[in-house]
Amino acid sequence: MAAEAWRRAVQKQFAAKSFVAFRDLHRNAFREMFERFGLSGDLDACIDEAFDEYLRVRAYPEVASVLQQLEKEVALAIVSNMDTMLLLEALHNNGLSFTFVITSEEEQRYKPAPSIFQRAIRYLGLPAENILHVGDSFEEDVVGASAVGMGSLLIQRSGRSKDPVPKGTKVVRNLGEVRDFVRRSWE
């Protein structure tokens, strides 16, 4: 129940008309959770702990090797709802890098806003239909990428999605399957 309430609180912030930085988004979501569940505490300490956790998260085992293989074959970019410095530090902590890093902070809009995906199209210099966006959220990633004409894959490592997934959505379980999908699409 609390996890779903947190997810809804964050989604509400993503959908807000005016942009707020990722840290402020968390502050607003924590404040809403505190009020909803009658909690008290230090909001800044909660936010600091949440951000420390983002930096402790380790990439799945296949990520680095698959990205290294793919970058020899295609241009890679990351489109993220994280603030730029937090994302860059998380990537660095995992030994990962991308040619193009596009963040909601830079665009002042969260996924699924078309503008953040359009920025990726401009950076990559490719027609939208030649770009494949891979993400773990149907609403933020698949809907957003599809709205600007990109292809999309939904990654569901557990086999279950945090969002309802309509029929016809292309789903993979890991980045190895993404690599295989990309290679098959060239045949």
Label every PLM stretch briefly.
Residues 31, 41, 64, 68, ...:
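Asp-based, Mg2+/Mn2+-dependent phosphohydrolase catalytic module
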Residues 1-61:
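N-terminal helical cap/lid subdomain that shapes the substrate entry/recognition surface
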